[in-house]
Amino acid sequence: MASLPVQFTRNQISSPFFSVNLRREPRSLVTVHCSAGENRENGEGVKKSLFPLKELGSIACAALCACTLTIASPVIAANQRLPPLSTEPDRCEKAFVGNTIGQANGVYDKPLDLRFCDYTNDQTNLKGKTLSAALMVGAKFDGADMTEVVMSKAYAVEASFKGVNFTNAVIDRVNFGKSNLKGAVFRNTVLSGSTFEEANLEDVVFEDTIIGYIDLQKICRNESINEEGRLVLGCR
């Protein structure tokens, strides 16, 4: 088996047959430059014997380019994930109408931008609404009645849902990362594909919750769930 010596530096990866220069551009982009190294050996026989290694160098270079793009992609995606905050004066009130297009599939003609809106203790306007693909970052729903709501593909990172009643709701593929759900009630609630990474699930009520096995395993990793909640969920 032939081996291909490769040297690594901070901005360059090289071997006798190829080199890759990595240069970071503005906006977290990475530029990759590949070049073939010169064969300094003399003799046709030696050149022929090294030819497969040159091909390996080209393949390795292409693989490194693909790897670099893969590494860079999450950074680009993170920077471009959310659109600019809506400047519409009534954007928070649009939650009272909901997003009626696409519904459970989270398809919408225009983002439902509820970021940083305050719906604290709202007992009437949110009940039964469809909030598909809603942007809820930093929003406050503390004490609100959100029974029978449909939240499909909503992005609720760092939002507050303390004491919210989610009875009979469909919480499908919602990102609750770092959100505060202390004392929230998930009774007869569908929790399919939703994530709660670093969320506060203290004193959350899970009663007759419909949840898949894989999703259950992920929720059970959250250490803020009390013993009663873990028992109801069936966490091991």
UniProtKB/Swiss-Prot annotation:
Main location: plastid
InterPro entries in the record: 5peptide_repeat
Pfam families listed in its UniProt record: Pentapeptide (PF00805)
Keywords in alphabetical order: Chloroplast, Plastid, Repeat, Thylakoid, Transit peptide
Span of domain Pentapeptide repeat: 124-163, 169-208
Transmembrane segments: none
Organism superkingdom: Eukaryota
Keyword Signal: no
Localization of this protein: Plastid, Chloroplast thylakoid lumen
GO cellular component terms attached to this protein's record: chloroplast thylakoid lumen
Keyword Transit peptide: yes
Oligomeric form and interacting partners: Interacts in vitro with LTO1.
PANTHER family: THYLAKOID LUMENAL 17.4 KDA PROTEIN, CHLOROPLASTIC
Name of this chain's protein: Thylakoid lumenal 17.4 kDa protein, chloroplastic
Source organism per UniProt: Arabidopsis thaliana (Mouse-ear cress)
